[in-house]
From Swiss-Prot:
Example GO BP: maturation of SSU-rRNA from tricistronic rRNA transcript (SSU-rRNA, 5.8S rRNA, LSU-rRNA)
Pfam family, one: UTP25_NTPase-like
Family stated for the protein in its record: Belongs to the UTP25 family.
Bias (Acidic residues): 58-79, 116-160
Subunit structure and binding partners: Component of the ribosomal small subunit (SSU) processome composed of at least 40 protein subunits and snoRNA U3.
SUPFAM superfamilies: P-loop containing nucleoside triphosphate hydrolases
InterPro entries the record matches: P-loop_NTPase, UTP25, UTP25_C, UTP25_NTPase-like
Gene3D superfamilies named in the record: P-loop containing nucleotide triphosphate hydrolases
Residue ranges, compositional bias (Basic and acidic residues): 36-45, 164-175
Protein name from the UniProt record: U3 small nucleolar RNA-associated protein 25
The entry's keywords: Nucleus, Ribonucleoprotein, Ribosome biogenesis, rRNA processing
PANTHER family in the cross-refs: ORF PROTEIN-RELATED, U3 SMALL NUCLEOLAR RNA-ASSOCIATED PROTEIN 25 HOMOLOG
Cellular component annotations (GO), alphabetically ordered: nucleolus; small-subunit processome
Length: 716
């Protein structure tokens, strides 16, 4: 396995899919002083006076982020006992006194103190002012406004046909026990089906005789929604489109879903449906608690009535999102579906999340604009609280119903393992997780996503005012992870997403993977060229990087070095940054390629560096250009002068293959730098690249290319 990246540095870039770094826009600096430069380029004109021509980027040390203020308890609790309920009660008997919240305490003390303040206090105040996501303190009687009102919205009473009741509120104990036992033993059964032209792989606990594949739904009328949401859904969403018809029965049935066909075109439809489901879950949970409060109040203190309707903490839904703009879209959909009378802190929210400046023209691809338009900041977190008539933004996490965050933002809120100030109790009762644009999160630091999932649904260290007589039994049994629904929306599947589904999705309702039948990108390049796919042998995933490098240096490099003068215009595309460093070092130090001039553009290259490399590549001073996938993801450079492309590895995103293999070579033909039909593409792949390969060559071809005895495949 690739390394997990640096332990304490949140923006670290490790191996492929394990320690991806931050957004890659700009150049970071080392906390140990200036970065030492690596000679990662070679110019054709050796007496060139520009020293910058021989410079190349080196991976900078990670930027250390500032401390984030939270309500974390600093005590280092012991590990959980094998008997979760008893261990939980024992941990709370040690210290049941509520902890004083930091900002409230400081505010009260300040009233009786002189006006003078220390430098540290001023620094803390300045830090809080800079933190635009700082949560506001709620009054102690935070739920006082939630008075019982007589209304006709009583359709959420116990309903055996409502998935909310059958999955969360009143599940069948025997059925759940059998399925949870099967899940804990890793006993799963699989069924395959076709849903609206999407291939569905349904996995369910093997204790079942068989799990039916839900049929597509035509519209919101078939859903068990709160009456108010049913009315707004009919107006705001209407009849379902094809994407919603396939997605809705899986989503509202509380199955885990890995949806691998999220596109720019259907993204809004999927977002609306997901937000509707999240709101429905929050409203049903909240109203059930309020009505039970009323029942208990009528019965009095001596009642034996047992109403278990809660978790340990209030937050029920978590959205993991790549940028502030993606958060803005989700929040606006929730607001439109909710139609609140009041929105508390809405102006502050818009100041922090709305960026009306148009940054990109139509020359940028649609998927690029969809991701990076608006505020593309990947450091944020937001709590949202609902009352009957109000939405409150920036509520404290422990008083929130829905949490929105980037992986980095939530990781910072949880805290650092090094200083033992971790606070993740607010994740203990999350019942629905939505990971939107997961393919974009893969280009950030995926380790943060893994860290968050590792800390979901753990039993809390502190009581946080919890009434344990109201906590559902399956929380006390430490089964919360078996009830949580996880929804992952991605443009495509990757090994990281499949592993996330395997390791962290233990839903007793089962899980479903949806993905399309891929026609392939080979015939969609818009230019005639020779495409050669060469398969190399690799004995395991761990040894794949070494086998790939060995094949590249023994089978690809010799022909490149032999015809060094004819190598002008060779672009080498490298998906992994670790592989990029290895290849760059080889070109810089190996005698086998000492006659080959080269340049490099990675995600760490700043604008001047990248501009020099592009210019030298265009005029031939760099005959070879090394180019990473993340650099292309964040910049989408329009490289000119490309005459042949070597894919050291295939990109995850099939759009990148079209843009690089088709777009760059087509541009060279238009610029009359390349004779029509003379461009070439060479791809290096192994059997472990099957997911990437399928999207490029098509679902029908991929099996033969992986399994046939021959190892070379040509397409013209």
């Amino acid at each position: 396995m690739a390394p997990r990246g640096r332990g304490g540095n949140f923006r670290g870039r490790g191996g492929r899919g394990r320690g991806r770094g931050g957004r890659g826009r700009g150049r970071a600096t080392s906390r140990f002083g200036p970065n030492r430069r690596f000679d990662g380029a070679r110019l054709a004109d050796n007496d060139e006076s520009e020293s910058s021509g021989s410079e190349a980027e080196s991976a900078p040390e990670d930027e250390v982020m500032g401390d984030v203020d939270s309500d974390a308890d600093d005590d280092d609790e012991d590990e959980q006992s094998s008997k979760p309920y008893m261990a939980l009660l024992q941990s709370f008997t040690e210290n049941n006194a509520p902890k004083a919240k930091r900002r409230k305490l400081e505010h009260q003390e300040a009233q009786g103190q002189p006006e003078e303040s220390s430098d540290d206090e001023k620094a803390d105040e300045e830090e809080e002012e800079k933190d635009i996501d700082r949560a506001e303190e709620d009054p102690e009687d935070q739920d006082a406004e939630e008075q019982i009102e007589d209304d006709d919205d009583s359709e959420d009473e116990d309903n055996l046909t409502d998935p909310f009741d059958t999955h969360f509120a009143h599940p069948d104990d025997d059925t759940v026990a059998k399925r949870v036992k099967a899940v804990q033993k890793g006993e799963w059964a699989t069924k395959r089906a076709l849903i609206q032209n999407l291939r569905a792989t349904v996995t369910y606990p093997s204790s079942d005789a068989g799990s039916e594949v839900p049929k597509p739904m035509a519209g919101p009328d078939g859903l068990s929604l709160k009456q108010k949401l049913k009315e707004t859904a009919a107006r705001k969403i209407g009849e379902f489109d094809a994407a919603q018809r396939a997605f809705s029965p899986l989503l509202f049935n509380y199955s885990d879903v890995l949806h691998c066909d999220r596109t720019v075109r259907n993204s809004d439809s999927l977002r609306k449906l997901t937000c509707l489901h999240a709101l429905n879950h929050v409203f049903k949970t909240r109203d059930r608690v309020i009505k039970n409060n009323y029942k208990l109040a009528k019965e009095g203190q001596d009642t034996e009535l047992e109403l278990r309707d809660q978790g340990f903490t209030r937050p029920k839904v978590l959205f993991l999102l790549p940028t502030r703009n993606s958060c803005l879209r989700i929040v606006n959909i929730i607001r439109d579906l909710c139609e609140p009378d009041q929105q508390e802190n809405r102006k502050r929210f818009e100041e922090g999340y709305v960026d009306k400046e148009a940054k990109f023209g139509d020359d940028r691809p649609a998927d690029f604009r969809d991701l990076f338009e608006g505020s593309d900041d990947d450091m944020f977190r937001l709590g949202m609280k609902f009352t009957r008539k109000t939405i409150k933004y920036f509520s404290q996490f422990y008083n929130s119903d829905i949490l929105f965050a980037s992986p980095l933002g939530l990781r910072m809120a949880i805290g650092s393992e090094e200083d033992k100030k971790l606070d993740f109790d607010f994740l203990s009762s999350i019942e629905m997780v939505v990971v939107d644009q997961a393919d974009a999160l893969l280009m950030q630091n995926w380790e943060h996503v893994e860290f968050i999932f590792e800390h979901l649904n753990l039993q809390p260290k502190d009581a946080h005012g919890c009434d344990f007589s109201r906590v559902r039994n399956w929380y006390l049994e430490d089964w919360a992870k078996h009830f949580r629904q996880t929804v992952i929306l991605s443009a495509f599947n990757t090994p990281e997403l499949s592993e996330l589904l395997r390791l962290h999705c233990h839903n007793w309702a089962g899980k479903v993977r949806l993905q399309p039948e891929y026609p392939g990108s080979l015939s969609q390049l818009g230019v005639k060229l020779k495409q050669t796919f060469s398969r190399f042998r690799s004995s395991s995933v761990d040894k794949d990087p070494d086998a790939r490098f060995e094949y590249f240096t023994s089978a690809i490099v010799p022909s490149l070095a032999k015809r060094a003068k004819d190598a002008t215009g060779t672009l080498i595309f490298i998906p992994s940054y670790l592989d990029f460093v290895r290849v760059r070092n080889y070109f810089a130090t190996s005698s086998a390629v000492e006659n080959v001039t080269f340049g490099a553009i990675s995600e760490y290259a700043d604008v001047p560096e990248a501009s020099r490399a592009r210019s030298h590549f265009l005029n031939g001073r760099h005959r070879v250009l090394l180019y990473t996938e993340r650099a292309h993801h964040f910049r989408r450079y329009q490289l000119r002068g490309v005459q042949r492309v070597i894919f050291y590895g295939l990109p995850d995103n099939p759009i990148f293959y079209n843009e690089i293999a088709g777009g760059y070579l087509s541009k060279s033909e238009q610029d009359m730098r390349l004779e029509p039909g003379q461009g070439s593409v060479k791809v290096v792949f192994s059997k472990y690249d099957v997911m990437k390969l399928e999207r490029i060559v098509g679902s029908k071809r991929v099996g033969k290319m992986i399994q046939e005895r021959g190892d070379t495949f040509e397409f013209i």
